[in-house]
């Protein structure tokens, strides 16, 4: 499979209410940090968080989000798509991104050898990026402007 240029941001990160002073892993040890157990976010957090960080592992995403919204955890570790939904459904909580743990932008897969199709897809992505449509979609679905994305 060949991959197109990136067209959308996806990342895992730390999200918290305004006033929670977290900008890196080193700041997490002052807070209760919620994460869905057994996920890539959990593995990364376990590896990079300082010793003594109070990591609250929850069995599934729904319980993880409920714990955060209820104030049982201070920091939500999750993907930006999930966080965007939590932010939009809880505007009074004033939740904001704190830092990115891992970037994993979205690409379109094309059958290997399909050079014309790959070029068409890349031109389409470029056209929609330059025309602002991808930024509009990023704002609508992620609540953030389209960041610089890698190009292949």
Annotate each language-model stretch with its function:
Residues 2, 26-27, 47-50, 61-81, ...:
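Short helices/loops that flank or line small-molecule/ion binding pockets
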Residues 7, 16-33:
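Flexible hinge/capping segments at coil-to-helix
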Residues 7-16, 84-126, 144-152:
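Periplasmic-binding protein-like
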Residues 17-18, 38-40, 60-61, 77-84:
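Beta->alpha turn/N-cap motifs
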Residues 21, 40, 56-70, 102-104:
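Short helix-initiation/N-cap motifs at beta->coil->alpha
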Residues 27, 79, 113-127, 133-137:
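Short amphipathic alpha-helical coupling segments at ligand-binding clamshell hinges
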Residues 40-59, 94-97, 126-152:
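Ligand-binding clefts/hinges and TM-proximal coupling segments of bilobed small-molecule sensing domains
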């Amino acid at each position: 499979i060949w991959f197109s240029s990136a067209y959308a941001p996806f990342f895992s990160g730390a999200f918290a209410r305004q006033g929670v002073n977290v900008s890196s892993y080193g700041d997490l040890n002052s807070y209760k940090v919620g994460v869905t157990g057994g996920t890539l976010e959990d593995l990364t957090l376990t590896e990079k968080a300082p010793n003594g960080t109070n990591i609250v592992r929850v069995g599934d995403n729904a319980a993880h989000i409920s714990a955060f919204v209820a104030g049982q955890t201070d920091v939500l570790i999750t993907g930006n798509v999930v966080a965007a939904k939590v932010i939009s459904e809880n505007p009074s909580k004033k939740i904001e991104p704190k830092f990115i743990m891992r970037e994993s932008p979205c690409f379109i897969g094309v059958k290997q050898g399909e050079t014309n199709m790959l070029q068409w897809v890349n031109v389409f992505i470029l056209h929609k990026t330059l025309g602002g449509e991808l930024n509009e979609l990023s704002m609508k679905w992620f609540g953030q402007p389209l960041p610089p994305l890698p190009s292949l």
